[in-house]
């Protein structure tokens, strides 16, 4: 049994770039050593054998907890999911093998969150967890320093590549002649994710739809259902001035 035990458990709470990241790990390392758990109730997940979808129901969360006990090391790709935070808060002995992979927004919630009783309680839980982590994986050393300053953590710092870098692909985009081009190109978002507030941005830009603008939406990553919704709304609002990038 010990021989088949997964060494490294990756827990994702944010879906951008997941497929490419998983493919990169499986291609360059032994896939049998890695298990990827994605905490989501929506969208499809990678169909690889070492990828599982974990929903909010009790039985799924039991699977998550079981895998957290079985593995050697845990990589937390984002510290936002409240159920994951509660699991770690009430089972703090798991923190000694947890490494937080900083996404950015999960660190800066310290500054960006709206003050309320629930928000304060949420931050108390996060503070306890971050303070007692084994390691923090951050591409930017300053992010690690901020985590130490804000959360008084003694976690070790581990340098890592920025998510897209190892899975970089070149894509051919049309060249724009700035001298003769009469349009202003506006990029909205960088993935099909509700957190990027595409619809709100569309509303603000709608009053300019008859001007010389073109809207470009990169939607190669993220949720399929949300992607379709954005494409439909973009075409309805901007017509042939709306462009998408759905494949890389």
Where is each model-derived feature located?
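Membrane-proximal helix-turn-helix segments that form the acceptor-binding/catalytic region
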Residues: 65-70, 116-136
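Active-site proximal beta-strand in glycosyltransferases
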Residues: 73-75, 92-112
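A short, active-site helix/loop in glycosyltransferases that binds the activated sugar's phosphate group
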Residues: 126-158, 166-168
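Conserved donor-binding/catalytic core segment of Leloir-type glycosyltransferases
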Residues: 10, 175-196, 202-205, 215-217
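Acidic anion/phosphate-binding donor-loop and adjacent secondary structure
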Residues: 1-3, 162-183, 195-196
């Amino acid at each position: 049994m010990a021989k088949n035990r997964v060494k490294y458990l990756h827990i994702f709470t944010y879906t951008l770039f997941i497929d490419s990241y998983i493919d990169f790990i499986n291609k360059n390392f032994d896939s049998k050593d890695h298990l990827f758990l994605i905490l989501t109730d929506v969208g499809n997940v990678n169909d690889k054998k070492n990828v599982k979808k974990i929903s909010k129901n009790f039985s799924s969360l039991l699977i998550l907890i079981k895998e957290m006990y079985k593995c050697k090391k845990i990589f937390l790709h984002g510290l936002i999911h409240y159920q994951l935070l509660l699991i770690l808060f009430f089972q703090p002995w798991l923190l000694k093998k947890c490494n937080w992979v900083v996404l950015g927004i999960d660190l800066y919630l310290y500054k960006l969150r709206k003050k309320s009783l629930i928000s304060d309680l949420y931050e108390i839980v996060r503070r306890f967890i971050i303070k007692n982590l084994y390691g923090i994986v951050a591409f930017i050393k300053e992010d690690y320093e901020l985590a130490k300053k804000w959360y008084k953590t003694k976690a070790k710092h581990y340098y890592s590549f920025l998510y897209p870098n190892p899975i970089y692909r070149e894509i051919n985009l049309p060249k724009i002649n700035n001298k003769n081009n009469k349009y202003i190109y506006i990029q909205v978002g960088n993935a099909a994710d509700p957190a990027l507030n595409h619809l709100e941005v569309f509303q603000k830009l709608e009053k300019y739809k008859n001007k010389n603008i073109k809207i470009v939406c990169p939607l190669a990553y993220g949720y399929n259902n949300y992607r379709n919704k954005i494409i439909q709304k973009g075409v309805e609002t901007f017509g042939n001035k709306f462009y998408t990038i759905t494949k890389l």
